[in-house]
């Protein structure tokens, strides 16, 4: 393990890079912006080897994720507040289609009145969209939970929302233990080239009910 001083948003970017994500559609919104800025820099520096796609809106970003997930790619995006509200319709589609993806959300209040302070209303309003929601309480938890989320989404066939407080965690520096790439690779094997999906019997309800069990199982494996 390598010790680093990271913000919550930097921890997300490091975890995405370590997870060998293949497609990242990106659109900035405060306080999430430095997630995609860090990934853009990692792409420019040759650290991130996946596709980094700059899009014109949060809605388009999630639409890209849906298309990439249909093709079997490991995919990720990030947003906050009104950006998450904007993609509400597509959240239902991603979950209903049983697509594997991870979305990081830096909690921020919804207007009106206009406010950029931390508030969980944005993610709580998406409770019934069918996404697994994982909430973080420290920068270390953010990095660990993003890694966990990619395993949970792959095994449960449901998209995962990783949630953390805007500014209080997204912009605060904390000491973080970053695992080596080889250790992450052993925990997150590549996705199969031909994902198995039983089209005639999606079992959406079973998948959602099984997701909490899968999350606990993956957490135990993560700590092993």
Write out the residue ranges for each language-model feature.
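Thiamine diphosphate
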Residues: 1-125, 130, 139, 147, ...
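Short, contiguous, pocket-lining structural segments
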Residues: 8, 27, 31, 141, ...
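Structural beta-strand/beta-sheet cores of well-ordered domains, especially the beta-sheet scaffolds
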Residues: 25, 99, 158-160, 204
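Conserved anion/nucleotide-ligand pocket segment
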Residues: 132-135, 140-178
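Conformationally flexible catalytic loops at phosphate/diphosphate-handling active centers
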Residues: 160-224
């Amino acid at each position: 393990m390598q010790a680093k001083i990271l913000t919550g948003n930097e921890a997300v970017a490091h975890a995405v890079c370590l997870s060998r994500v293949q497609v990242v559609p990106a659109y900035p919104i405060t306080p999430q912006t430095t997630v995609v800025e860090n990934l853009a820099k990692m792409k420019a520096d040759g650290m991130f080897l996946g596709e980094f796609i700059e899009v014109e809106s949060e809605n388009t970003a999630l639409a890209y994720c849906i298309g990439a997930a249909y093709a079997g790619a490991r995919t990720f995006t990030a947003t906050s507040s009104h950006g998450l509200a904007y993609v509400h319709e597509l959240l239902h589609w991603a979950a209903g289609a049983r697509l594997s993806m991870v979305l990081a959300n830096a909690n921020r209040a919804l207007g009106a009145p206009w406010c950029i302070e931390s508030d969980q209303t944005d993610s709580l309003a998406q409770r019934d969209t069918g996404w697994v929601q994982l909430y973080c309480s420290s920068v270390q938890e953010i990095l660990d939970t993003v890694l966990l989320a990619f395993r949970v989404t792959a095994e449960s066939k449901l998209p995962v929302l990783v949630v953390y407080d805007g500014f209080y965690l997204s912009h605060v520096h904390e000491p973080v233990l970053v695992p080596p790439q080889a250790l992450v690779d052993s925990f997150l094997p590549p996705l199969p080239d031909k994902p198995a999906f039983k089209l005639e019997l999606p079992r959406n309800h079973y998948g959602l009910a099984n997701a909490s069990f899968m999350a606990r199982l993956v957490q135990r494996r993560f700590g092993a």
